[in-house]
Structures are given as C-alpha cells and as structure tokens.
C-alpha cells in the first residue's frame, strides 16, 4: 500500500484534489477534521489545554473557545509549540489507526489530507507528498469569497502560513492549480490512478508499518 500526503496552502484547491481521490474509491483521512473532533466537548484534551492556556478557554458548557485558544497559542512561538505537543500526538494516533485499517482491508492507496503535514510526524507516515499550488492572487480571491472577508485579510492569513517554497522543497509530487477546475481534476485523476497502480504492485495487504 502507498500512503500519499496531500497538502497545500489555503485556497490552493486541495479539497478539489482530495475529492477526486475519494471518487476513485481511495480511503482517506482528513487530519484537519480530526484536529477539530479531538477538541469537542468531553475530550480529555480540553482540561489539559485549560491548565496550559487558562481555564477561560472553556465556555461554561465545557466547549472550547477556539478563537481565544488560538490567540494565546499564537501569541508566542512557545505557545504554538506547546499546543502542537498536546494535540499532534493524538492526531497521529488516529491517522495511524485508520491507515492500518485501510492496509488490512487491502487498499492499494491511502491518503492523508492535511494543511499541516510538513514538519510533523504525519509526514513520516507518507511514502509520497503531493503539494497543491495556486497563484497567490487566486488563493486570496478564493479565501475571501469562501470566508466572506476582505481580500486584505485573506492575504494576511495566507502570508501567515508555511511559505509555498518550503512545502515544494519537501514534495516529490506537485499539482499546479493555475488553469481551470477541469484541468486540476484531470491531473489529480491521472496521479491517483498512477499511485493506485504503484500501490497494487507493492501489495495492499502488507501488515507491516
């Protein structure tokens, strides 16, 4: 089985690419969705985060004030590092469980979809890393339209993310979203079929990690 990480900056078209892989029957895990799920009310991580970042990051009903947590975590580098050290291990544990289930089911290809893969343990789980890129102005326009914010705010958000050149330096596969949607979907389909074939040759039922 081949494990592919798909990543990219906001507004790059990553969701379009992962939708193509899903349509081809590829099992995939959304690491960003897992990061939201593990912070839902009742999660054992919440009191740990409250001890580190302040009890007031939790509302009276026990749910997380995500904006306040983000404000405090990103106020200093050590805050972001502390947040990552608490949250990322649980994300990786869940990713690994789903990856093993896909392998045991005989899948030839498994996809880890996440905005933050590069530089984390999730990257170590990948045989290939695909970065989806798009022109800066295109990404800004998409973010502004999607989130209902001014282009200037969208640009600031994008500039705060990992630089594209850093992602590209770690990637062995690149999908450039600089034409129309159909072109991106076609390129993603070709890549998916190539990797499915590679994974089938490798063997889907190998139970080694």
Regions from the PLM with identified roles:
Residues 96-105, 109-145:
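ATP-dependent NMP and nucleoside kinases share a basic, alpha-helical "lid"
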Residues 12:
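ATP-binding Walker
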Residues 94-98, 124-125, 145, 149-201, ...:
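Small-molecule kinase domains that catalyze NTP-dependent phosphoryl transfer to phosphate-bearing small molecules
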Residues 9, 21:
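P-loop (Walker A) phosphate-binding loop of NTP-binding proteins
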Residues 15:
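Walker A/P-loop
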Residues 6:
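Hydrophobic anchor at the beta1->P-loop junction of P-loop NTPases
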Residues 33-108:
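ATP-dependent small-molecule kinase phosphotransfer cores
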